[in-house]
From Swiss-Prot:
This is Biotin synthase. The lineage of its organism: Bacteria, Bacillati, Cyanobacteriota, Cyanophyceae, Synechococcales. It is an enzyme of class 2 (transferase). Keywords: 2Fe-2S, 4Fe-4S, Biotin biosynthesis, Iron, Iron-sulfur, Metal-binding, S-adenosyl-L-methionine, Transferase. It comes from Synechococcus sp. (strain WH7803). It catalyses: (4R,5S)-dethiobiotin + (sulfur carrier)-SH + 2 reduced [2Fe-2S]-[ferredoxin] + 2 S-adenosyl-L-methionine = (sulfur carrier)-H + biotin + 2 5'-deoxyadenosine + 2 L-methionine + 2 oxidized [2Fe-2S]-[ferredoxin]. Pathway: Cofactor biosynthesis; biotin biosynthesis; biotin from 7,8-diaminononanoate: step 2/2. Belongs to the radical SAM superfamily. Biotin synthase family. The keyword 4Fe-4S applies. Residues 42-270 form the Radical SAM core domain. Its cofactor is [4Fe-4S] cluster; [2Fe-2S] cluster.
Length: 325
């Protein structure tokens, strides 16, 4: 059981910016104290991610190789069939994953056979004993309600960056539309998975601003993925330099302090980190990782590598329990 922690929804930009710029050891100590109080036991959730609909997206997100506006090697592919998706979910469950996330490269959910297939996938994933998460762009109230009825655990819809930096990253969807999507998901009774990306040319103040938006949601998102840009050839951000790994550690730590009971998920860009940097992220409060060899269209550490990482860090994950059963 987690201890009582102080949950705030009134964080100021100045407070968050000061945390991001505080001495690293002080920041890690504070994040550790919050994490131990709110989430004792160091249990790490393992989430597997599959691209159901790859490429051909109408959005122009500057970081994304799936956009039809860019010239990456990713091309539009047909949707995966329900059986193929559930077969992959079964493999993920057998490998020890807790959550199965499914992605559609869409601007918004489309009514019709594709949506009915999505609902079938959600039901099938839940029947396997896994949490089910979907990311597919904007949605209507009725679509959110039908997903909830199908058993959807979480809907992912990231903010990507701060309101101030947003227009330099995407022009085909407004920040307000993102916030409205989050509200529809919440009203349907589905939990939120919402975070962002660093390394896209934003300032420290932008990072603080994005975290402020997240931390002032009431309630906080249940899952907060922290991503580092994976610069892909053919996208507008292809030449963006890699971030210092300690910048990602700082983002994880501040997210943990601001949102004590949320799952802080170490997400895209993790493959660029060495083992020690990943363990620092776990120490800073990350309590979930994407587990499996790929994330949509980018690579991810191998399963055996992640098992070795978690063992070295001394943290528990569901595959430990499976092995002991």
């Amino acid at each position: 059981m987690s201890e009582q922690v102080d949950l705030r929804h009134d964080w100021t930009l100045a407070e968050i910016e000061a945390l991001l710029q505080s001495p690293l050891m002080d920041l890690l100590w504070k994040a550790q104290a919050v994490h131990r109080s709110a989430n004792p036991g160091y249990k790490v959730q393992l989430a597997s991610l599959l691209s159901v609909k790859t490429g051909g997206c109408e959005e122009d997100c500057a970081y994304c190789p799936q956009s039809m506006h860019h010239s990456s090697d990713v091309t539009g592919q047909p949707d995966l069939e329900v059986k193929a998706v559930l077969d992959r979910a079964r493999v993920a469950a057998e490998a020890g994953a807790d959550r199965f996330c499914m992605g559609w490269a869409w601007r918004e959910i489309r009514e019709g056979p594709a949506f009915e297939s999505m609902l079938s996938m959600v039901r099938g994933v839940r029947e396997l004993g896994l949490e089910a998460c979907v990311t597919a762009g904007m949605l209507t109230d009725s679509q959110a309600e039908r997903l909830a009825e199908a058993g959807l655990t979480a809907y992912n819809h990231n903010l990507d960056t701060s309101p101030e930096h947003y227009d330099s990253i995407i022009t085909t969807r407004t920040y307000q539309e993102r916030l409205e999507t989050l509200q529809r998901v919440r009203q349907a009774g589905v939990t939120l998975c919402c975070g962002g990306i660093i390394g896209m040319g934003e300032s420290v103040r932008d990072r603080a601003s994005m975290l402020q938006v997240l931390a002032c949601l009431d309630p906080h998102p249940e899952s907060v993925p922290i991503n580092a840009l994976v610069a892909v050839e053919g996208t507008p951000l292809e030449a963006q330099p890699s971030i210092d790994p300690l910048e990602l550690v700082r983002m994880v730590a501040v997210a943990r302090i601001l949102m004590p009971q949320s799952r802080v998920r170490l997400s895209a860009g993790r493959e660029q980190l060495n083992r020690e940097a990943q363990i620092l992220c776990l120490q800073a409060g990350a309590d979930s990782i994407f587990y499996g060899d790929s994330l949509l269209t980018t690579s991810n550490p191998a399963v055996e590598s992640d098992r070795a990482l978690l063992a070295a860090a001394g943290v528990q994950a569901s595959w430990h329990e499976s092995a002991a059963a």
